[in-house]
Amino acid sequence: GTRDMVDLCEVIKRYYYNPHTQGSNSIKKVLPAVLKSSTFIQAKYAKPIESIGLGSKNFPPEQIWLEKENGEIRNPYNLLPSLYENLTQEEIETTLSELDNVNDGGAALTAYGKIQYMDMSAKERNEIGLALKRYCELDTLAMVIIYEHLKTLV
């Protein structure tokens, strides 16, 4: 049709090689590889999201997705906030989900299942929901960043 959708994973598998992915086609490996390899992407995402024309319903306007530690670019999935950053220590001790972070697909599936089927406080359920939204938003942004990078290569 006129608006066919393209699976970026297929594009990556067929046409993209980056040694920083260590042979993986996973978005969790491709995103950090792109951040390490592209000066265009580095320059753009080293700024707060509000200054590069991005809005967010789940992150503050001053969120920066490109951070370095000891000269190395950090994986943005490791920048996702702790699941219970808005809870007190006492509230954390009474949580039932036994999750720390939602920063990969397995944790996201587990978290979603737990909020569906576990009896937990509304506050814990809300925190897990927020963590899922943040994770999904970063996944979406990762696809945008990868697409932007691919556009610079053609």
Model-derived segments and spans:
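DEDD superfamily 3′-5′ metal-dependent exonuclease/proofreading module
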Residues: 1-154
